[in-house]
Regions:
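Alpha-helical metal-binding/catalytic segments enriched in His/Glu/Asp
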Residues: 1-13, 52-56, 62, 67-87, ...
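Acidic/histidine-rich catalytic neighborhood of metal-dependent amide-processing enzymes
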Residues: 1-47, 89, 93, 97-103, ...
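General structural feature for long, well-ordered alpha-helical segments within catalytic domains
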Residues: 2-3, 17, 27-28, 73-76, ...
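Structural motif
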Residues: 4-5, 29-32, 52-53, 184-185, ...
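Metal-dependent peptidase/peptidase-like ectodomains
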Residues: 23-75, 122-178
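Short beta-strand elements
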Residues: 51-58, 103-107, 118, 207-210
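His/Asp/Glu-rich mid-to-C-terminal helical/loop segments that flank catalytic regions of hydrolases
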Residues: 71-89, 124-125, 130-136, 171, ...
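Active-site-adjacent substrate-binding region
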Residues: 75-92, 99-101, 147-148, 157-206
Length: 243
């Protein structure tokens, strides 16, 4: 086989595993993240991802004399949340369907903070979702005065938009999975990997299965036999890449 290079992204789960990745020093034509799920999974499309944090400033007054004075940040936050589409959430979407997720929230009468993540595979829909998230704040401010401030930033983009331009890395991985005696399952990631960022650094980086399931929950597990097949797949990739 040819030269093999390995990198570790210790901050992947907080979305920063590739922030300081030295793509120039890594110097490969393509790469793979070992961050997939079930046996045979091969993914080269990810979400476009953004996060918006709303900060709501309320007015606290003794409840006995609060009429016409109190601005309850708890209630304003609840109203803001109600403006998002009820069915466009993770528990009601699949495949290429995007969503909004209220990731965490802290609130009391005087102030509230809400963190939403925004996801969509389609770039235009992603832009529309971000615009909608900003419009939500504008609607609340129009009703209650300027009580909402927000910070919106992009986290990563759909690596498929890069990889589709040259799918050799996908073709090699697909054949390698077959050579390992496994049936490839090519599906979009309903999430992101370090490859979502690395692909935009000039190294197309699809994602390969590792045998895990039920990620980010109390029922998460990995299958040792499937992990072994993932290792076999990497060996097969090394063989094919030399050709």
């Amino acid at each position: 086989h040819g030269e093999i290079r390995i990198a570790f992204g210790p901050d992947e789960e907080i979305g920063r595993g590739a922030d300081h990745f030295d793509a120039k020093g890594f110097a490969t034509d393509y790469a793979y993240t070992m961050d997939g799920g079930v046996l045979g999974e091969l993914q080269y499309e990810s979400f476009n991802a953004a996060q918006i944090t709303y900060k709501i400033t309320g007015v606290s007054v003794h409840p006995g004399t609060a009429k016409g004075k109190m601005k309850n940040a708890n209630m304003i936050a609840a109203e803001l949340a109600s403006l998002f589409p009820e069915k466009e959430v993770p528990e009601h979407t699949e495949g290429y369907e995007g969503f909004y997720l209220l990731h965490n929230m802290q609130a009391r009468i005087e102030e509230a903070e809400m963190v939403y993540i925004i996801r969509d595979h389609d770039k235009e829909k992603f832009l529309a979702r971000k615009k909608f998230a900003e419009e939500v704040a504008a609607k609340i401010n129009e009703k209650y005065g300027n009580v909402v401030e927000y910070e919106l930033y992009d986290q990563y983009y759909n690596m498929g938009d890069v990889i589709k331009e040259d799918k050799r890395c996908v073709d090699v991985a697909e054949q390698a999975i077959k050579n390992a005696g496994v049936t490839p399952i090519i599906i979009p990631i309903r999430g992101g990997t370090d490859g979502s960022k690395i692909s935009y650094m000039g190294i197309p980086t699809p994602n390969i299965f590792v045998g895990g399931e039920n990620f980010h929950g109390q029922y998460e597990f990995s299958c040792l036999e499937h992990m072994t097949k993932a290792a076999d797949t990497i060996v097969e990739i090394a063989k094919l890449a030399k050709k």
